[in-house]
Amino acid sequence: MCRHLAYVGPPVTMSSLVLEPPHGLLRQSYAPRDMRGGGTVNADGFGAGWYPAVPVGSPGADPVRYRSASPMWTDAAFAAVAGATTAGALLAAVRSATVGMPVTASASAPFGEGRWLFSHNGVVRGWPAAVAGPAAELPVTDLLTLDAPTDSALLWALVRHRLRAGAEPGAALTGVVLAVEQAAPGSRLNLLLTDGAAIWATAWGHALSVRVDAAAALVSSEPLDDGIGWEEVPHRHLVTARPGQLRLAPLTSTTPQTR
């Protein structure tokens, strides 16, 4: 299992979202409140991806990623980077590796390509045999160049394949969740995706909360604090969030409910 978050809004330091909140990802790495399906800590690596600030009118820069196989609380270099780095969008995660899967930096989220950043909180049941069918839709080169031999890396490859084909981001996540659930029933499939302007996420087997106001959107496995405005996402729902807009839709439906 893992914990993850994504933010889009006014530029803030990474530290203010990841390290400093009373229940930020740093605390969730060693004292999570709502781990489901096994695991007690998230100490098998972590990562963060952020979108560098660019001058007004300039095209947006692709995100920068920092990934490690160490627990977040042991990495003084990341703490320094997070305190000195300001971004208007980011995705970060802490990892609890499924038994038998490698603990390496390349196995830690976020995964990415171009403008996209992606994370998975959960597990694919019966890995790897159960998902041979969905994996067969990928080009062989995609399978040979997975970031790591893990379920999360394969899920990213499946989502990325749909995005490359022109799928709308929410539809790409929905299609992958439903295909993998059919092939591997009982999987836990909380997926998180951003392009730096909006956030898409699924709640499928694990907790997920959102906080959206006119200025910012924040999606997190667990609320970062006890402040007002947090909303728990119902099980088996798709989230589309951007500043000033939150949409929820059942993952078996294509009709969103705008909040």
Predicted feature locations:
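Short acidic (Asp/Glu) patches
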Residues: 31-33, 68-84, 88, 92-114, ...
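Catalytic core of PPM/PP2C metal-dependent serine/threonine phosphatase domains
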Residues: 89, 166-203
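Extreme N-terminus nucleophile/cap motif
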Residues: 1-70, 201, 236-238, 244-259
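Long, charge-dense
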Residues: 135-161
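Fold-independent oxyanion-binding glycine-rich loops
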Residues: 10, 93-96, 121, 196, ...
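Conserved beta-strand-loop-short alpha-helix elements that form
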Residues: 2, 116-126
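Cytosolic regulatory regions built on CNB/CRP/Popeye-like sensor folds
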Residues: 59-62, 68-69, 126-138
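A conserved acidic, glycine/proline-rich C-terminal tail/linker
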Residues: 207-238
